[in-house]
Every structure is written in C-alpha cells, then in structure tokens.
From Swiss-Prot:
Belongs to the Rab3-GAP regulatory subunit family. Its main location: cytoplasm. This is Rab3 GTPase-activating protein regulatory subunit. InterPro entries: Rab3GAP2, RAB3GAP2_C, RAB3GAP_N. Pfam families: RAB3GAP2_C, RAB3GAP2_N. It comes from the Eukaryota. GO terms for cellular component: autophagosome; plasma membrane; presynaptic membrane. Probable regulatory subunit of a GTPase activating protein that has specificity for Rab3 subfamily. Rab3 proteins are involved in regulated exocytosis of neurotransmitters and hormones. Rab3 GTPase-activating complex specifically converts active Rab3-GTP to the inactive form Rab3-GDP. GO terms for biological process: establishment of protein localization to endoplasmic reticulum membrane; macroautophagy; regulation of GTPase activity; synaptic signaling. It comes from Caenorhabditis elegans.
Length: 1307
C-alpha cells in the first residue's frame, strides 16, 4: 500500500535578482566556489529498543505498508541534482521568524534580512549590514531573530530584533533596518555557540550559550535596555558605545554539572520537582544548612546536549531569579526620574555597571542523564513544549518526553537529517507532527508522535534541499500562553519555500483511532459532490469497513436517477477496498433494477390503447353518466400534488429495502410528501401501459408493504391525483382490487370504509362503484366455480322446497341499489358546489344518515349568502309540487331525461337536484332551513348580521304554510337564539339584587344599545307567531321521505356495517314538528314584558319593569319554558301594581311620540286600564300638527278637566301668534305679553297640516291660521270645567274678534 504524499504549498521564493545581490554581498570572493558539501558521519549498529523502526536502507515510498489504501503508480527515484545557482544558501546560517515572513541570513561578519510582503510571493531585501571592526574577531558564530512587543500593548509588534553572537564573545542587537541598538560582551576567551530566544507557556528567556555554561538573560531587563537604547539613539543623546557602557543587562551565568562541552541548550519551562517533603528544606550550601520555603520551589529546567552526554536536564532554582526581577524593576523605576527631576537639579548619579563576562557562575545541578554514548547533531522542541526531537551521528532520530525525561521514540536510517515540527488546530484540539528530511535518501517524511505512524512521505528531486522551522511569532515580553499553529517549510534545490500542509485527521491514524480519522473524512465528504473524483479519492482513504458501508449508503441516497446509480456502483466496484462492502452493491443494484423498471412502465400508453366509452361491468346507464361526469371533473383539479413527482432513486434506496418482510410506511419516520412520492412510484404503472396481471406479480407482490398499507397508499395517490380518469383506468383498478381481495380477504371492506370516510364525494363515488364491480365479479367467479363442481358430480334434482338454506343464493347488501347511492351522492356533490367555503364539507359517513337534511342545509346557506328574495324561493320551490310528484311512467325514461352536469348557474343546480330528489325540496322544509340558517348567521355575528333576524321574522309567518311546522321553527329559534339575549336585556335594565354585572350582560347580548329596541320588536313578532300558531291547535305534520333517499340509506347501512333499522338522524322539520305546544298565556305574558321594555327604552324612562309592572306571581313566570303552565294573573293584579302600570303609561304618553302612545294604548287595553292622558296626549299632538279632525276625535274620548283646558289654551295662544305673523299685524303690548306668556314653548311647536293632495284629511283640516284659530277655539271651548279655566278662552276670543274679526263664541 502507498502512503499519502506530503502536501507542499508554494509559499515564497528568492528571485534571481535578490539571490545574486545577497550572494554577492555575503560571500563576496567565495561566491563562485563549489557547492557546500555535507559532512558524513559514521554509522553504528548500536542496539535499539523494540519500538525502533528499521528504515536504514533506502526504500521506495510506494511499497511502504504503514496504513492506507493501495494506489496504483509509483514515484520515480530521485537523483542528485546538478549545481544550482542557489546552493550557497545552505552554506550560510539561516534563521526564520513569524512563519518565514522574515529570513535572517548570516555569513562571517555580514548579515542580510529578507521579508515577504503580504501580497507578493517573493522575498525582498530589508537590510544588508555587517559588524564593524576586525572581521576575524567579529565573525558571526550564532544568530537569532525575534519580535519586540509594544510598550503599551503586549500583543502588538514594535520592531524586529536581530541578535548576533561573535567569535570574541560579543552579542550585538540590531533592528530589522540594520540599526545597532546595544552590544555586550559575555566572554573573553570563548566564542558564542548559540543565541536562543525561548518562549514556553510558563515563561520566556534569552539564552547565550558557551562551551561550559550559558547565560540566562532576564526578558524584562532585555526589553527595558532595548527600549532605552532606541529612545536615546532616536534623540541622538548617546551613541551605541555609550549606551552599552552605561546600561547594564541583567543576566545570570549558569554552570551546569556536565562532563563535556555544551552543544545545544533547550529551555523546557518552569517545573516543580516531584520530591518528598523532607527534601524541600535541603540547601546546596551545606549538609546542615536549611532553607525555609512555604511551598515547593519553582525550577527553570533546561535540556542540554554535550559531547560526552547525549541529553541531560539542568535544574535552576527560580528564587534567585525572582530577586533579580525585583532588582530590575527597582532599577527601572530609578532610571525614570533620572532623565527629568534628578538631572534637572544636577544630583543624578550613574549606577555602577557590572560587565557580563565578570559575573560569577552559579552552580546548576543536573538530573536524568540519557544515553551517554551518543552525540547530538540537531535538536527541535515541539510547539507544546512536551517533546524534544534530537538527531545523532548514528543516523537516529530520537523523541524525548520532557515531563518524564525519557526517550519515547527512535527512528533509524536518517543520517544528517533535518527535523522540524508542525502543529494543526481543530476547535480545541491540537495535533503535532514531526517532519524529517533525509538528504542522503532524498526523502521527506511526516510522523505522528502519539501513534508512531508515518502519515506522509515523498521523494524529492535532489538532496540539496532542507527543512526549516517557520519561526514562532512570539514577542519579547509578549503573551506566552496563547497557542498558535507552528509551520515548517521545505526549501527545494531552487531555493523556493514550500509550506508543509497537514490536515488534522492525519493525526488520528493509529489503529485505535481509525474511527476518529474516518469521522473527519466523513465531514469532508458532506461538502463534496457525490460521484466526483474528490469524493472517490476521499472514499478510498477510509480505514474502517463500517465507515465505507455508511458512506456508500449515504452516497446512494443522494443520487437522482437509476442510470446515475448504476454508474456509481460500477465505479465503486473498481476500487480495491470495495470488497469490504460485502453484498451491499448487489442488493442495491437489484433494488435499482426494480425501481428502473417501475419508472419505465409509468409512461402513459400510446396508440394501441383506446379510451372506452363504457365499463366492462354491468353498470346502470344513469350510474355510468354520473361517473363519467365526475371522472371528468376529477381530472380537472389543479390544486393537488403533481402526479409526476416520484421518489428519486436515492430516496427509494433510503426508505425501501426489498429484502425486508414489511415496511411501515405510515410510521412517524415517513413524511407525507415521501408517502405521496412512493405512491406515485408504485401506482404509476397502474395508470400506464403495464399489463395488470404482470403489474400485480412484479410490483405489488415484490414490494415489502402490507396489503392494507398498499390500499392506503393507493387512496393517497387517487385522492390527490390530477390524472384524467377514464373507463380503462377504472377497469384496471377493479382488476387490481380483485387480485388484492383474492390474496387477502377484507380489502374491499377497507376500500369501502375509506370511501365512506372521505370528504371528497367524487372520489367516494368512484371507490364505491369499484367495490361494487369487484363484488359482482367475485360473485360471478364463485358461481362459475360452483357450476363446475356440480357438473363433475351427477347430482339428482331435488324440489326447491327440500333445499336447505345453504343452497339458496345469498344476496350481498353492499352490491344492491348502487344507482340510488350514486344519484344521492351526486346530489350531495351538487349541493356542495353551491358554496365556495369548504368548512361545511363532511365525511360521506357523516352525510349518509341525513342526506336530505345536508342537501337542504347547503341550499339554505346559499340562499342566505346570496341573498335570494321571496319570489325566487317561491319559484324554485313551489308550494304545490303536485305536477312533478304526480308524474307517472317508466322510471328508466325519467332517468334518461335527467341532465347530469355541473352548471355554473346556481339556480340551474337547484333544478338538477330537484329533478332527481323532488320530495327533499318541499317548500316548507326548505323555508324552515332558510330561517334556521338566518338565525344561525345572526347568532354568530349578531352586530354584523342583525338584518337576518328581521328577514327571518318576515319570512317565517309568510312562507311556511303548515302552522305546526311554523310553531316548531319559532319555538326552536326562541329557545336556541332569542331567549338568552332577551333575558340578558331584562337583567341589564333591572340592575337590582344579585343580577349579573353590566359587562357580562352586554357580552351576552352581543350588539349595541341602538339595536335593543329593534331586537325587542322582533321578539314581539316571534311571540306573536307562536300565539297565532297555537290558536287552532294544529295536528302533527307528516312529511314523506323521498324513495331514492330511503333506498340509498338502507344500502349505506350495509357499507357502514349497520343494521337496516339503525338509528337515522331526525330531520330538522321532523324535530320542529315534535316540539310541544307553547302556553298561549305565558307567551302573551312575555310579549307584555317585551313591549314594556321597548317603551321604556324608546322614551328613556328610568324604570324597573319587573318590579313595578308585574306582581310577584307574574315575575316568577318569566323566563320559564314556554310550554309550562304557571299561574299568570294577566289582568287580576293588586291595586298597587295597577297604579304603577297607570303611572308608567302616563309617563309614556307625556314623553313619547305618537308611535309610543299607540303601543301604550295597546298595553292599556291588554291590562284593562283607562288612562286619560294617553288619549289627551294623542289629541294634543294632533292639534300641534294641525290635524284638527283627528284631534277632535281623540278629544271626544278624553275626560274633560281644567288641566286639559290649560294645555289647549296654550296651543290656541300659539296659533294666535302665528296668525298675527301671517296677517302682518301687531298686538298691543298687553295683548302681546299675555299671549307670549300663555303660549310659552308651544309657539314653536304648532304648524298647519301638510300632506299630499290625495290625503282625505286635507279637506277636513284648516288650511289657514285664521281657520285654525277658529277650529281649535270651538273644539276646546267645552273642555274647561270651571270659570277660572274658561277665562283664557273668553279673552282669546275677544282678541281674535278685535284684531281679525274671528270668533267662536258670541259674548
């Protein structure tokens, strides 16, 4: 098996021009020398531990068998490249920073800084600089590049610092622009071996390494010194030499207890040793000395490699360093005022500077010496500071665990190797990889540390390559705990930099973590197009068989067509790892073949199949006509789902498994759309060209769905289909149900039940007809089988009387009276077409018990909503339908004359139903439903539909002929709709005792107060209808049921599995006729209350009618059932109640209009009272309007008294004032004051009688004011009963005679 090649992303390159400039500046006269030859080290065959990998011999990458899938093709063996123009790069010292954004190249005493611009793929020269002085003593032996954090923001970069160590022990600090900031000498006798700026999670430090020891420079002190130097140089206050001689760099020289010379030093962070409690107080000074510490001390740990010890760990106590930091901080504070106040007053003092090379060494103990016989070449610390990778001269690469200080991995066969680390982050997880470049083998490898697995490997074209770390972008005194990804870069023979890109999932390649590896790849597959090259490549990288199976199945679910699925499976089989899929591809191809054939047979027939005019079964002609009409309407539906939308092959494979015994398609896991698509797929061939027997054997028998669920799916498909249904499809459906019934008994009963439960009447009619045809066919087949059995046996003929019950032919009720059922359901469908609202559409099983009532209800709703006037109702539903009902003749001829269609005109729809079931539409029955529908609409929205109650009280007494039906309808309306509202109005007016609150009563009433009077008037009309209906005690009515409906009801009982005598819901008319007769006197008692309430509300009186107008016994009778018989003293009440009634009528007469006084007179007659004020107020109102004729008649029936005389005198005075205005005369002052004072407000009320010329009262009334004065004087002259009351008439007679010559009494 092959290993995944290393992904090398092109990052940056050194252009030819830049390379020539750098080469010429650094190398000078040595620029044309031969390329740098790598030193060879001798190999040894030392014994290794059992976990070493034997990779010493040169092997090809393509034959490795670490992990992964086998791929074809092999990489060509790399050869040594020729001389390159950039091989000088490997002769120089190369350092990187911030993912190779900055490069530091040093040679002898010169250095060059290169930088990669963000938008360019090549390096640019930032500076070219050298160290002044003796070129031999200033030869650069060590270098380092790091960032300097900003003073105020530790996350911001201030500048790049270049640190250079020389042969004479100096360390110089430059900026990236080549400006020297500071230098210090750390040794006089030794060169600087290395400079390292180390950053770990627990801290950071700057290390200067020599042969026997190393300096640990405090980072705070280094930052302070560099910033002071930048400020002083920028202000030109001091030179670099003056700064370096005046400012001291705080450092500490550590002398570890080692044997050989130091090669490498790695800072491994701060640690607490796992020592016993008794050793906490031990001191290095002497055996008896004791150190008191509150807790375990912190130690700075270093890993050191020497010439005699492969790896040794150095421990340094942090206590002294902490004291050092305090001194640095104090020193920094003392320096700040020295630039200002101290210097201003001339009292500043320069601190005593201690040279770094003069510092005394501090002893540092060592622990855990590892492999003394080896000599290290290269070292590299992991990004998380847990591991250190070391190469030795024995061609080994060792990985050391810092925490346990042990070797955890050893790799063989990597002589002169370069090592580096790469870290990759995903969410909160970090993966680390070790990159190894073996130049002798031209091999680049990537290993995981945790699993010890080679995840990537690749041959490179030339050995003149290298791997370098990208350089951390950590800054001096910046944040240490923030993790960032670490990158490594591969430098090829052309000097181009390539970033080694490693996906995170490669870290999960251990055999115990293959499921996690596959999980990451599955995430990639979700975003990859199924069937593409990338998808197949990722699929081949999966490790576990379960992952392959899951991925294969999920990929199948995303496919659309069968051809695409076949191609996909063929491609999968070409992959070597497809054998782990087992039998999945075979079963999938089998299922896809079934799907493809089913889809192919779904196409409609062409040419050879002709539409048939009739069915293959003996259906009645009227049934065929009705079914043709509804089948045509069935295909005209546009609001249903698309029949062509079938399951895609992916969905088919996801939800349907042909190997299963049963699939519950009606479980919660299936959505409604998925069921519909499955139904379209299964029953598509039924509407296509597939032979029905072959269709049943190859589709319905093979699909793992129960027969009952198949029927449900067919119902879903048939219910929402838009396909045109013809007799061919009808016959095929019958044959399908025949086969289903043969295989499992009870299918037709299930279809029957579905038809009865359907709200779609055309669908139910077609299904019932299909079941009828299937049952007839089953009966015929059963009879043929019995005839064959009788022919096989010679049976003797017997007399019919001797036959047993089993020998008689059984009659199936379900197969009888299909014509009656279809005709009634056709009328139901016509009735539903009258309404646009579908809220009243019920199931057929709910309509069956009351077909006639349901049809009339729909007709009533149409009449109310249209609306239809009374004349149209009389025309559509005549009161005497004897001509239609008396028609005699052949029933078949009458059915042929019936028109079967769905007309647009609603009145024509009524006529179509009337010709089929005329008795359903008797006049009184229809009007009764109309009245009930009006009141129902009023009760739902009382305020908006208030006019319906008036229409009902108008239609009810005029149109319903039968008094018993009229009485029942009025009684039901009163009890259901009127009674509670009427009672609430009475309670609201009373407002006494523990009555309901005003808010509750208004809510019960449901309309505004302005409509209360009109409602009470309609209540009076309803009560009047009840009284008129019971005067003659009408007998119960007997409505005959339509024969067609009766036969259909008996057949429906069989379909509903009920007996023929099952309870049938009462019609509304029958329910109304059964209402008990009301008590005439109790109804009259309520009418008196309604009239009294209306008078009170119209006149605005503050009165309590129940407490004042009726006695206690009468109050108890209110709101009782109208058919009860309580004691009601209508006219025999106590005197107190009579007086209150009298006072009430007097107030109405005084404050009401003529209409209210007319109603008050009606109450007066009912209560047998004599109220003079009513007649007199009527007369007075007539005189005010100039109707003297009517006023005289009313005055004649009044009791004459002085009070009436005064009222008439005021009207007479008002007429005299109007007469003066008409004659343009002026009264004397005394007369004028007298008449005005006497007339008062009546002067503005009086007027002459005005009406049309056809009015007979025009000639009987005065036409001028003079005639009016004379007429009223004569009529009122006899009213006064005393001399005092007659004085105004005598005086006004003199005034009329004096001024106008008119008089009515001779003085």
């Amino acid at each position: 098996m092959s290993v995944t090649p290393v992904i090398l992303e092109a990052y940056c390159a050194v252009s030819d021009e830049v390379a020539k400039q750098v080469k010429k500046y650094l190398l000078g006269d040595f620029a044309e020398e031969s390329k740098f030859e790598r030193k060879n080290s001798e190999s040894s065959d030392g014994s290794e531990t059992q976990f070493c990998r034997a990779t010493e011999k040169k092997e090809n990458v393509e034959v490795w068998d670490d992990w992964g899938d086998k791929e074809e093709g092999a990489a060509e063996n790399s050869l040594e490249s020729d001389e390159s123009i950039r091989n000088w790069l490997f002769r120089c010292d190369l350092k990187t920073y911030s993912d190779a954004e900055y490069l530091l190249v040093t040679w002898e005493s010169r250095f060059v800084v290169l930088r990669k611009p963000p938008d360019e793929p090549v390096y640019k020269i930032v500076c070219k600089q050298y160290i002044e002085g003796d070129p031999i003593s200033n030869e650069i032996t060590a270098s380092s590049i790091f960032g300097l954090s900003n003073v105020r923001h530790i996350e911001l970069l201030d500048s790049i610092i270049i640190a250079l160590g020389t042969l004479d022990g100096h360390v110089y600090f430059f900026t990236e622009q080549g400006t020297m900031l500071y230098f210090d000498r750390f040794s006089i006798f030794e060169p600087v071996n290395s400079l390292q700026f180390e950053v770990v999670k627990t801290g950071q430090t700057f290390i200067v390494v020599f042969t026997k020891g190393f300096f640990m420079i405090n980072p705070i002190s280094l930052k302070s010194v560099l910033y002071q130097a930048k400020v002083l140089i920028a202000k030109c206050e001091k030179t670099v030499k003056q700064i370096s001689e005046s400012i001291e760099l705080q450092s500490e020289l550590l002398a570890p207890d080692i044997k050989g010379n130091i090669i490498h030093v790695i800072f491994t962070g701060l640690h607490k040793p796992s020592t016993l409690e008794q050793y906490i107080s031990a001191s290095y000074d002497s055996f008896y000395a004791k150190v008191e510490k509150p807790s375990l001390p912190l130690y700075s740990t270093f890993m050191v490699t020497t010439e005699k010890e492969f790896a040794v760990f150095v421990w340094h106590d942090r206590e002294e360093q902490d004291k050092l930091i305090d001194d640095v901080i104090k020193y920094g504070k003392s320096l700040v005022p020295s630039f200002g106040i101290r210097k201003f007053f001339g009292i500043s003092t320069e601190p005593a500077r201690i040279a770094s090379h003069m510092r005394s060494a501090v002893h540092a103990p060592t622990r855990s010496i590892i492999m003394e016989t080896r000599v290290a070449q290269n070292v590299s610390r992991s990004p998380d500071c847990q591991y250190v990778a070391v190469t030795d001269r024995m061609a080994r690469v060792l990985v050391i665990d810092i925490a346990s200080r042990q070797v955890v991995l050893i790799f063989k066969g990597y002589r002169d190797a370069s090592i580096s680390w790469v870290s990759v982050t995903e969410d909160d997880r970090v993966a680390q990889f070790l990159t190894i470049f073996a130049p002798r083998r031209s091999l680049l490898e990537v290993w995981t540390v945790l699993g010890n697995v080679r995840v990537c490997a690749q041959h490179v074209p030339s050995s003149e390559c290298n791997v370098v770390t990208g350089g951390e972008n950590k800054m001096l005194c910046g944040r240490c705990h923030v993790h960032t990804d670490s990158n490594s870069f591969f430098i090829d023979e052309k000097g181009e930099f390539h970033r080694i890109a490693l996906p995170f999932h490669l870290a999960l390649t251990s055999r115990s973590r293959q499921d996690q590896h596959d999980h990451l790849l599955l995430k990639q597959l979700e975003n990859t197009k199924t069937g593409g090259e990338d998808w197949f490549q990722t699929f081949s990288d999966l490790k576990m068989a379960t992952s392959r199976k899951t991925t294969f199945q999920n990929a199948l679910h995303n496919l659309s067509t069968a051809e695409e699925a076949h191609q996909f499976i063929a491609r999968i089989r070409s992959i070597p790892t497809s054998a782990s899929l087992g039998d999945l591809p075979n079963s999938a191809e089998k299922s896809i073949g079934f799907y493809a054939r089913t889809v192919a047979e779904t196409k409609p027939p062409v040419g050879e199949y002709d539409d048939k005019d009739t069915s293959n079964y003996k259906l009645d002609s009227i049934v065929e006509r009705i079914l043709e009409c509804h089948m045509q309407k069935f295909g005209e539906r546009t609001d249903m789902l698309n029949d062509s939308e079938v399951m895609k092959v992916g969905e088919w494979l996801k939800y349907v498994d042909l190997s299963q015994e049963d699939i519950d398609v009606f479980s919660e896991h299936w959505s409604e759309k998925q069921r519909h698509c499955l139904a379209n797929l299964i029953f598509g061939p039924l509407f296509g060209s597939f032979e029905i027997d072959e269709y049943y054997d190859t589709v319905l028998e093979k699909i793992p769905v129960k027969r009952k669920n198949i029927v449900k799916l067919f119902y879903m498909r048939f219910e929402k289909t838009t396909t045109h249904i013809d007799w061919r499809i009808f016959n095929r459906i019958v044959e399908m149900f025949l086969n289903l019934e043969k295989s499992e008994t009870g299918i037709l009963e299930q279809v029957d039940q579905m038809a009865m439960d359907s709200k779609d009447v055309p669908l139910g009619m077609i299904l019932l007809s299909i079941c009828w045809c299937a049952r007839i066919q089953i009966r015929i087949l059963k009879g043929n089988d019995e005839d064959e059995v009788e022919n096989d046996h010679d049976l003797e003929e017997e007399d019919e009387k001797n036959k047993t019950i089993d020998e008689w032919d059984a009659i199936s009720p379900e197969a009888e009276h299909l014509d009656c059922i279809i005709m009634c359901l056709h009328c139901v469908s016509l009735a539903q077409s009258l309404l646009k609202d579908d809220s009243n559409i019920l199931r057929i099983s709910d309509v069956v018990p009351r077909i006639d009532s349901y049809i009339r209800e729909n007709v009533a709703k149409w009449i109310v909503s249209t609306p239809i006037d009374t004349d149209t109702i009389e025309k559509l539903f005549p009161r005497d339908p004897s001509e239609n009902l008396a028609e005699k003749g052949n029933e078949e001829d009458r059915r042929k004359q019936m028109i079967i269609d769905f007309p647009d005109d609603k009145e024509v729809v009524i006529q179509r139903m009337y010709q089929i079931i005329p008795r359903v539409f008797e006049h009184d029955l229809v009007v009764a439903d109309v009245c009930w529908e009006m009141m129902s609409q009023w009760f739902r929205e009382k305020d908006d539909n208030f006019s319906y109650i008036k229409d009902c009280t108008t239609l009810l007494p005029q149109s319903i002929v039968d008094p018993r039906l009229r009485h029942g309808i009025a009684r039901l309306i009163w009890d259901k709709f009127i009674f509670m509202v009427f009672q609430s109005i009475v309670n609201m007016v009373e407002k006494t005792g523990r009555r309901p609150k005003d808010k509750e009563t208004r809510k019960e009433i449901g309309f505004g107060e302005v409509k209360l009077e009109e409602f009470l008037m309609e209540c009076e009309k309803f009560l009047e209808v009840l009284m008129d209906s019971v005067r003659d005690m009408p007998p119960p009515i007997d409505f005959k049921q339509d024969l067609l409906v009766e036969m259909a009801s008996s057949s429906f009982a069989a379909h509903l599995h009920q007996s023929k005598t099952a309870y049938r819901q009462d019609q509304f008319a029958i329910l109304a006729s059964r209402q008990p007769l009301v008590n005439f006197h109790l109804v009259l008692h309520h009418q008196h209350l309604a009239l009294a309430l209306r008078l009170q509300l119209t006149t605005g009186l503050r009165f309590h009618p129940l407490r004042n107008l009726f006695c206690v016994t009468g109050n108890r009778a209110f709101f009782a059932s109208l058919d009860s018989h309580p004691l009601i003293p209508l006219d025999r009440v106590d005197d107190a109640t009579m007086e209150k009634r009298h006072a009430f009528l007097v107030k109405v007469a005084e404050q009401g209009s003529m209409e209210e006084r007319r109603l008050a007179r009606h109450l007066e007659m009912e209560w047998k009272l004599t109220v003079n004020e009513i007649s007199f107020m009527q007369a007075l109102s007539s005189f005010r309007l100039g109707n003297d004729h009517q006023g005289s008649l009313e005055l004649a029936s009044c009791v004459r008294d002085d009070r009436s005389a005064v009222a008439l005198a005021r009207v007479l005075a008002a007429r005299l004032i109007q007469l003066a205005n008409e004659a343009n005369k002026r009264y004397s002052t005394a007369h004028s004051q007298y008449l005005c004072a006497l007339a008062g407000e009546e002067a503005a009320r009086v007027e002459l009688y005005e009406n049309s010329p056809d009015d007979p009262l025009v000639d009987s009334n005065p036409k001028t004011w003079k005639d009016a004065v004379t007429s009223l004087g004569r009529a009122g002259n006899s009213v006064p009963q005393s001399a005092q009351a007659a004085i105004p008439f005598v005086r006004m007679n003199d005034i009329a005679k004096l001024y106008f010559g008119a008089q009515w009494v001779n003085n």
